[in-house]
Curated annotation (Swiss-Prot):
PANTHER family: 50S RIBOSOMAL PROTEIN L9. It comes from Streptococcus thermophilus (strain ATCC BAA-250 / LMG 18311). HAMAP family: Ribosomal_bL9 (MF_00503). GO terms for biological process: translation. This is Large ribosomal subunit protein bL9. GO terms for cellular component: ribonucleoprotein complex; ribosome. The gene is rplI. GO terms for molecular function: rRNA binding; structural constituent of ribosome.
């Protein structure tokens, strides 16, 4: 019996795949547990339409990520931070991914989820720093930060 997998089934198939499986297995397990449905012409047509719309949506997301990358990596787009600095040259506060995301929104109107900013640890130094950002699985960018001493 041909079935369309609705979810990943270990050892049998991934979501969206059309495969031939034994009749009893399909009826008694896959279809009962809503893991698959029978591959009728109508169901296959629906699947193809759904896959096309998902591909279109993925292409739109990729184009948007590339546009944001271009905007982030412009030379004049440098995030400005002013922090108090102690005698050892380290800032009193730290600059976290959340702060960077908020400043991007405030200074340039670019909304990025803080989880996409790849900061190993909060920044506590002054100067020019580049921080990597994962905008899409295929698109990475660098945010330029300029951290100044508030006493200057």
């Amino acid at each position: 019996m041909k079935v369309i997998f609705l979810q990943d089934v270990k050892g049998k198939g991934k979501k969206g795949e059309i495969k031939e499986v034994p009749l009893g297995y399909a009826q008694n397990f896959l279809i009962k547990k809503n893991l698959a449905k029978e591959a009728t012409k109508q169901a296959i047509g629906e699947l193809k339409g759904k896959q096309k719309s998902e591909e279109k949506h993925a292409a739109e997301l990729l184009a948007e990520a590339k546009r944001v990358k271009e905007q982030l990596e412009k030379e004049e787009n440098r995030l400005q931070f002013t922090e108090k600095v102690g005698p050892d040259g380290r800032t009193f506060g730290s600059i976290t991914a959340k702060k960077i995301a908020e400043e991007l929104q405030k200074q340039f109107g670019i909304k990025i989820d803080k989880r996409h900013i790849e900061l190993e640890h909060p920044i506590r130094a002054i100067g020019l720093i580049e921080v990597p950002v994962k905008l899409h699985k295929e698109v990475n960018a660098q945010i330029k930060l300029n951290i100044k001493n508030s006493a200057e």
